[in-house]
Amino acid sequence: MTEPARRFDVRVGSSTDGLAPVSFAERSLGAGPLQWVALAAIALAAVAADQLTKHIVSSQLALGDGVHVLGPFWIHHVRNSGIAFGFFSQATAVVIVLTGLAVAWMLVYFARSGARHPILPVALGLVIGGSTSNLLDRVRLGYVTDFLDLRWWPSFNLADSFIVVGVLILLATLVYAERDPRRPRTISDATARPS
């Protein structure tokens, strides 16, 4: 008995202009060892920087105290039981669960698509590192230490900054990928006609 014919969609527009079955193309997008090392290094550096700065602020400034740095910028020791920038401060348990789910989802996404773009380990490393650092504080302490204060925005910390920068990098990468005429396309993309 002969094996049923397999249906392969193919992708065109690669650097070799060759055709490859989708199964191979998708497999090659998964994160390899180098991507995982880069992601881990960036995430760990983000956690270390955030935890160190929180420790310095907590040990040098009493809760509620502040130090003027420059212009509208202050170092102001406050506690936050919510997510970034003080939002959802009354729902600590929900925030812990949602943060854990978000980090797990990002790791699964990276495992499947980590080689899709060279900037992904940087962007996701920042987001995962920032999220993990704040998550550790919420689980251990029930709150996070915020200290960066611009007066016109709720106080935040380095972890919040890493999350925002990582998300902005991801968005910029997505926008660039959509506008890049050299990006790989599927056969259906190449033959589609505007209606």
Where do the protein language model's features map onto the residues?
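Alpha-helical transmembrane bundles and membrane-interface segments of multipass inner-membrane proteins
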Residues: 1-195
